């Protein structure tokens, strides 16, 4: 399942929503290394103080807080206080990495560090704004009509891209009801159509179910062995 070609802004929004759901889900009440949970803590863990009783899914997840540098993800135990689960630097598919537990617990960065690059105006953009300002002074009539970006119309999007935008709009309410488990995010190609293999997100160590679709998202018949193989035929896009 790949995430190539998807716009950065929707993916960042989805990541924030998924971690908001994770913090309020069953994993939030997981205990630390005590209460017989040590056997599930490979590589060591940090004991969480004042932890409540184990919630559903804690035993399966290991019930630990991950240390700095240890792997983490949306459906794995939380990072220790002061750490955040982040994709690796230059990760090509950050959303997928966090969904399958390939993130890393790292020191939380302050707001000033995250916004430093964004706050620095690019030289080309600054010069462009200066040029536009001078042009408006020379031609006052042109300033009456503000320049607006040309949004992509729904009719110009592929069916998978429209589906993805719809999912992002609904996530804000669904994740806070525990709807992040078994989440299905459409797997789109560069043209906005469905890739041949679609999968639900993994839960813990269990991989989510996958199925095959055509470019319009219609499910294709399962393999002749009846096992629902994820080896999709060449008839579908992707």
From Swiss-Prot:
Region (Disordered): 104-159, 218-238
The organism's taxonomic lineage, starting at the top: Eukaryota, Metazoa, Chordata, Craniata, Vertebrata
Domain Thyroglobulin type-1 positions: 157-232
Function: IGF-binding proteins prolong the half-life of the IGFs and have been shown to either inhibit or stimulate the growth promoting effects of the IGFs on cell culture. They alter the interaction of IGFs with their cell surface receptors. Activates the MAPK signaling pathway and induces cell migration.
Signal peptide: 1-25
Residue span, IGFBP N-terminal domain: 26-108
Name of the protein in its database record: Insulin-like growth factor-binding protein 6
Biased composition (Polar residues): 226-238
């Amino acid at each position: 399942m790949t995430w190539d070609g998807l716009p950065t802004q929707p993916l960042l929004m989805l990541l924030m929503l998924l971690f908001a759901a994770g913090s309020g889900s069953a994993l939030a009440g997981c205990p630390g290394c005590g209460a017989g949970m040590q056997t599930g803590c490979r590589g060591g863990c940090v004991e969480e103080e004042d932890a409540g009783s184990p919630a559903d899914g804690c035993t399966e997840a290991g019930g630990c807080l991950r240390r700095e540098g240890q792997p983490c993800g949306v459906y794995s135990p939380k990072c220790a206080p002061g750490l955040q689960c982040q994709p690796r630097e230059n990760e090509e598919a950050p959303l997928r990495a966090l969904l399958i537990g390939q993130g890393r617990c790292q020191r939380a960065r302050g707001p000033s560090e995250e916004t430093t690059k964004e706050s620095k105006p690019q030289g080309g953009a600054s010069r462009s704004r200066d040029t536009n300002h001078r042009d408006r002074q020379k031609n006052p009539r042109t300033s009456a009509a503000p320049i607006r970006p040309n949004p992509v119309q729904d009719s110009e999007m592929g069916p998978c891209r429209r589906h993805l935008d719809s999912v992002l709009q609904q996530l804000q309410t669904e994740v806070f009801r525990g709807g992040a488990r078994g989440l299905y995010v459409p797997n789109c190609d560069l043209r906005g159509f469905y890739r041949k293999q679609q999968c639900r997100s993994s839960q813990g160590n269990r991989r989510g179910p996958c199925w095959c679709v055509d470019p319009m998202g219609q499910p294709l018949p399962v393999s002749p062995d009846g096992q629902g193989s994820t080896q999709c035929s060449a008839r579908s896009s992707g």
